Amino acid sequence: MQDAITAVINASDVQGKYLDSSALDRLKSYFQSGELRVRAAATISANSALIVKEAVAKSLLYSDITRPGGNMYTTRRYAACIRDLEYYLRYATYAMLAGDTSILDERVLNGLKETYNSLGVPIGATVQAIQAIKEVTASLVGPDAGREMGVYLDYISSGLS
């Protein structure tokens, strides 16, 4: 896992250069948004179960996927879906704090789409639930932090699509 600081420094180091004004601007932006990201992470951590519960109610609960024959019909499948959504929220929060998507590639997206396809997990419904997580999260953390968190939830959605 990288963070924004490591990514900026590594990019300059690979070129054997000091940090240029663009790199310093990226670091400045990262540090300026630090308090916002930490407050958002605290709110998300304190409300993670509520976020997932509301997202499921918004996106999946009354759809065909939860009816007999649907991919979330049995209690075991439903619990697995909830577990996965909690996992996406947690890792998106880590990525937001780090200001970098590498943890999402390493720990979430690497092979996930293929696994879901082989198990018959409906990717469209999963993406819909992730977008609902984004909406619910934004309503709790506010518009600025919601946009920041949305970047990482959208990254997961794009990686699955």
Swiss-Prot record:
Localization terms from the record: Cellular thylakoid membrane
The subunit field of the Swiss-Prot or TrEMBL record says: Heterodimer of an alpha and a beta chain.
Just give the chief location class.
Answer: membrane
Q: Name one GO cellular component term.
A: phycobilisome
Gene name tied to this protein: apcB
* Annotated source species: Synechococcus sp. (strain ATCC 27144 / PCC 6301 / SAUG 1402/1) (Anacystis nidulans)
N4-methylasparagine occurs at 71
Record protein name field: Allophycocyanin beta chain
Gene3D superfamilies with a match to the protein in the record? Phycocyanins
